[in-house]
């Protein structure tokens, strides 16, 4: 078509590779990668990472989200797929629907070496004298190339721990607790030409229900990931300013607590074993975008 796709940053980011594209959240980089990759390969990889299907959480009402394809659009909407829709899907916009749980699972699979994880609220249900139910822990390899995963993990580290990264102001300063992650902003709607003429120039000048959603996914510690987290703040604005600080506070608190807990257990002579599960049960599907910079 005749549409022009712009980056969130006026003037763009210049020459960009994977690390810079992720670290500085360059829309145009991901538009180009999506164009070269195509919607079918994007959809196939998204499903491997946990999108587009229920994950099996131990609660009713889990939503599957949606990963679109040419076949889906022809069946549901009755028209063929367009290249511009591939570009939008490449940054999680358009028809894409995700849940906070899926975002956290995606992050876990990216940083744990490409192993499928099955999210559970509990590991075991135990009566007074026996285990009543034990949740199955899946350890299926989803077939990702280790060197590719290492590149993504390094880029997510730079998002938070390199000064040019979009979440640098939300970094955890204690070296052993450092987190990596990715900021995102899910656009609710564009500012119209008429609104711009009336001096409505910024997203936070729109009515609250029409403002962008703030997103961040993260993991910690960077060197040996143990925790994955997703934060979605509806109508919160930019992910770097709103969602990333929440993830930082949670991940730092959990790690500090576990260090103190293990120290207390060791001093009492008990084995220092900890099982921590953090879950966001707000699994409403929403339109999401994970390349839009902020």
Please report, for each region that a protein language model flagged, where it lies by residue:
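C-terminal soluble interaction/assembly domains
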Residues: 215, 230-233, 246
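Short, histidine-centered active-site or binding-site loop motifs used for metal coordination
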Residues: 25, 233-235
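Short, charged, low-complexity patches
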Residues: 103, 118, 239-251
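Short, gly/Ser/Thr-rich active-site loops of penicillin-recognizing serine hydrolases
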Residues: 131-140, 246-294
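Beta-lactam-recognizing serine transpeptidase/beta-lactamase-like catalytic domain environment
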Residues: 1-228, 279-280, 287-294
């Amino acid at each position: 078509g005749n549409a022009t796709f712009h980056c969130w940053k006026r003037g763009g980011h210049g020459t960009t590779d994977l690390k810079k594209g992720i670290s500085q959240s360059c829309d145009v980089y991901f538009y180009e990668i999506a164009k070269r990759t195509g919607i079918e390969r994007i959809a196939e990889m998204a499903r491997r990472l946990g999108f587009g299907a229920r994950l099996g959480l131990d609660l009713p009402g889990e939503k599957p989200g949606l990963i679109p394809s040419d076949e889906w659009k022809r069946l549901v909407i009755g028209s063929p797929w367009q290249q511009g829709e591939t570009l939008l899907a490449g940054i999680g916009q358009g028809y894409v629907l995700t849940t906070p749980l899926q975002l956290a699972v995606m992050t876990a699979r990216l940083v744990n070496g490409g192993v499928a994880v099955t999210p559970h609220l509990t590991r075991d249900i135990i009566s007074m004298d026996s285990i009543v139910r034990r949740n199955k822990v899946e350890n299926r390899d989803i077939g990702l190339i280790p060197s590719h995963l290492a590149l993504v993990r390094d880029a997510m580290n730079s998002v938070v721990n390199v000064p040019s990264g979009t979440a640098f102001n939300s970094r955890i300063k204690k070296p052993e607790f450092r987190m990596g992650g990715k900021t995102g902003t899910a656009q609710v709607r564009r500012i119209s030409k008429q609104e711009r003429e009336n001096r409505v120039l910024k997203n936070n000048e729109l009515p609250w229900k029409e403002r962008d959603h703030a997103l961040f996914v993260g993991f910690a510690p960077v060197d040996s990931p143990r925790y994955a987290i997703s934060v979605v703040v509806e109508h919160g604005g930019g992910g770097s300013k709103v969602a990333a600080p929440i993830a930082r506070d949670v991940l730092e608190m959990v790690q500090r607590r576990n260090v103190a807990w293990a120290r207390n257990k060791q001093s009492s002579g008990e084995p220092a074993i900890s099982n921590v599960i953090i879950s966001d049960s707000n699994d409403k599907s929403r339109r999401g975008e994970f390349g839009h910079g902020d």
